[in-house]
């Protein structure tokens, strides 16, 4: 009863930038539902859930020298890491090790482009290191729910091993973007 929620979908399941633009428009129009601090630049956070855009991530991964394969043959994770570089690198390595132990192939990390200059001081002071990762679907695993179950287990095992990292999302179908 305190949160504003909006939903934008393409009923044909077509992934378009227009859908993202419409979702961001909802976020802007629900600004009155959000809490803000006295400086007026730091809110209590907002997020949008999107279908994974294979076209986008294929290009982004390729720019990093990563081959993610075909659509739904990989998962994308969204992470908020500690600002401390040592803790961040330690957590990243731990995630990679756990992925391997869970029978998954870790493909690589992508630093998410951000615009810290638009943040208020409070948000900037606590801004996490925002990264995405790519995890390959094992050949002996069906795409869809069976693969997402493996990603869920990976996420939960990692979360139990690391309290300095927030896993925003980890899926082969959807991704969550959050901001303040």
Residues of each region from the PLM?
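N-terminal segments that mediate ammonia production and transfer
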Residues: 1-180
